[in-house]
Design a protein with these regions (language model features):
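ATP-grasp fold ATP-binding core
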Residues: 65
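Non-heme Fe(II) oxygenase catalytic core, chiefly the N-lobe of the double-stranded beta-helix
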Residues: 48-60, 68-245, 263-265, 276-299
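Conserved metal-binding segment of the jelly-roll/cupin
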Residues: 242-257
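Gly/Ser/Thr-rich helix-start
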Residues: 62, 259
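Long, low-complexity C-terminal extensions of enzymes
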Residues: 303-313
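Ligand-binding loop in jelly-roll beta-barrel domains
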Residues: 260-271
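Fe(II)/2-oxoglutarate
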Residues: 1-58
Length: 313
């Protein structure tokens, strides 16, 4: 088993196969100005989406967008709101914990998207009116997708998560996941797109997410990531990319990954973890009815602020 897995993750990513990417770093595709220029044209938007879908399936399974948010003040205001939410939840005794890390290592805001819509609707509208989120989400899932988010803060000294896969089978133990037939294991990743927005600068010492490119192609992976030999292989071969504030990484949920160890002494490394779900397979976490109603004014702003698609002339 491990030999088959190793053969898959030994694949290399070549920039020549991805004309809209700016570069390849540590086997991961990095997108920036070339993509920005392309998606402003009528033909470039769908062509870029086709390339991104290929990168997430046949390619490394992960892409990074430089300066996904052009206005850093929008990111800063969202960060302030998330930190205020963490403080409020701790004071109320309802602070969230990270299910893939030791208790106390990280801070979590579960359901961060709808909480932001309620507490800071203007910030919500500015933050999520983002063409890169639209581009990559529709590339993977098509229209009518649903976005949810959970904020994860790895505090100084916070230890790495164990390597895992995500929705939906990734949240089950091996016994539960084994009850589902093979075609469900193949289908599950197609129902969700995982993303992480860097809400602060993330040099390696702060513990940015660890990834294993091409690991999503291993079909038994939802069972294998529980096995110690796969955990050990991941720890010896992972990729860890530093990110700058406003960068965004998106990846196939079947990719083996986990937050890294924060060895810094002062930086609370904050990532806004996005789960973008197909209308045919919603995420287990759903925005509450009250939050959806309270966010109606933000939704109006979102539609007004959402970047226009290129139109034929």
């Amino acid at each position: 088993m491990i030999d088959d897995f190793a053969a898959l993750v030994d694949q290399q990513t070549y920039l020549s196969d991805y004309p809209y990417a700016d570069t390849v770093e540590l086997n991961v595709l990095i997108y920036g100005q070339k993509l920005r220029a392309a998606i402003g044209t009528t033909s470039g938007w769908p062509a870029a989406q086709t390339e991104l879908m290929r990168a997430l399936t046949d390619g490394p399974g992960m892409v990074v967008f430089k300066q996904a948010f052009g206005d850093l003040s929008v990111v800063d205001r969202a960060t302030e709101a998330f930190l205020a939410q963490i403080t409020a939840e701790k004071a109320a005794g309802v602070a969230g914990r990270d299910h893939f890390a030791k208790p106390g290592a990280n801070d979590r805001v579960w359901g961060a998207l709808d909480k932001l819509a309620v507490t800071e609707p203007a910030v919500f509208a500015e933050y999520y009116a983002n063409d890169i989120i639209v581009l990559i989400s529709e590339s993977w899932l098509g229209p009518e997708y649903q976005v949810t988010s959970q904020v994860n803060v790895v505090n100084p000294g916070g230890q790495a998560q164990t390597a895992h896969r995500d929705y939906h089978l990734g949240f089950m133990d091996a016994v539960a996941a084994a009850r589902f037939p093979a075609q469900v294991h193949r289908l599950s990743p197609a129902l969700t797109l995982q993303g992480a927005v860097a809400n602060c600068d993330m040099p390696v010492e702060t513990g940015p997410t660890l990834y294993l490119p091409y690991s999503h192609q291993y079909e038994p992976g939802y069972l294998a990531f529980h096995l110690p030999e796969f955990t050990e292989y991941f720890q010896q071969n992972y990729t860890q990319l530093p990110l700058e504030k406003s960068n965004a990484a998106f990846f196939n949920p079947a990719l083996f990954h986990g937050a890294g160890t924060n060895v810094s002494t002062t930086v609370r490394r904050m990532a806004n973890l996005l789960q973008v779900s197909s209308p045919f397979g919603p995420a287990p976490w759903k925005p509450s009815t009250g939050s959806r109603c309270a966010g109606l004014s933000s939704r109006y702003c979102w539609k007004r602020k959402r970047p226009a698609r290129p139109k034929a002339t």
